[in-house]
């Protein structure tokens, strides 16, 4: 989340020469809290550089760039024209690594990735994302009411930061009713998820 401090590890490997040194590291999308000194790389020996980063408060949430603006009928709106044609949004946080190879100076960008493991799938990698403190989603994208019978609608709330609390309610068309009107949540732990059940009743006459 914006303003959060995270720890990252930059791993480098020189395959066939010992004349490579890391001169500098610049972080885009976050403030680097740790200092970096020039570090030579040893041949065929993995080198890990530990980084402490603070996500900038102004960092936007990770989202497909074509969904950042409200679309018109059949047309997406993209404010930054340089993004058009890219298959995905630029990484939220990336590192520009400056190297010296003998007498040659060069740099390259590395996106920050999240690495984790699942018992059934092994090691997985995905782009690091900046998310809001709270995520709210319906269990089903579509709920069909074929008659005037009430139906249950489940809403999932997940926290991405500790100590998140608030109230949740459903926005419905006029003449529709819901029980209860609101429900409260208090999520003390990061990553915790809870589900809430609402009973929605349609009106006697069909509406949209």
Predicted regions and their residues:
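Short, solvent-exposed beta-strand/turn "edge" segments of beta-rich domains on protein surfaces
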Residues: 2-3, 40-44, 82-89, 142-147
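Proline-anchored loop/turn motifs at beta-strand termini and strand-loop-strand connectors
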Residues: 13-58, 160, 164-190, 203
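Short beta-strand elements of extracellular/lumenal beta-sandwich folds
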Residues: 2-17, 147-162
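Beta-sheet-dominated interaction scaffolds and their linkers
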Residues: 1-4, 127-151
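Short, surface-exposed loop/turn segments at beta-strand-coil junctions that are enriched for proline
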Residues: 41, 52-89, 102, 186-190, ...
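Short beta-strand elements
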Residues: 104-137
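Short structured motifs
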Residues: 9, 32-40, 78-83, 136-142, ...
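Extracellular Ig-like/FN3 beta-sandwich strand-entry sites
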Residues: 5, 88-94, 150, 191-193, ...
């Amino acid at each position: 989340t914006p303003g959060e401090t995270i720890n990252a590890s930059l791993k480098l490997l020189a395959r066939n020469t010992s004349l490579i040194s890391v001169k500098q590291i610049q972080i885009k999308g976050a403030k680097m809290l740790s200092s970096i000194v020039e570090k030579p790389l040893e041949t065929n020996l993995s080198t890990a550089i530990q980084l402490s980063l603070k996500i900038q408060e102004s960092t936007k949430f990770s989202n497909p760039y074509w969904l950042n603006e409200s679309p018109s009928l059949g047309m997406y709106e993209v404010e930054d024209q340089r993004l058009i044609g890219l298959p995905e949004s630029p990484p939220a946080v990336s590192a520009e690594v400056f190297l010296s190879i003998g007498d040659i100076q060069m740099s390259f960008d590395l996106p920050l990735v999240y690495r984790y493991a699942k018992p059934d799938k092994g090691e997985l990698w995905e782009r690091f994302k900046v998310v809001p403190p709270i995520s709210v989603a319906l269990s089903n994208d579509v709920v069909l009411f074929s008659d005037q019978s009430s139906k249950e609608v489940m809403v999932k709330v997940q926290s991405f930061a500790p100590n998140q609390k608030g109230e949740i309610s459903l926005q419905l068309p006029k003449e529709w009713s819901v029980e209860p009107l609101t429900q409260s949540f208090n999520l003390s732990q990061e990553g915790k998820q809870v589900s809430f059940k609402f009973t929605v009743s349609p009106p006697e006459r069909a509406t949209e």
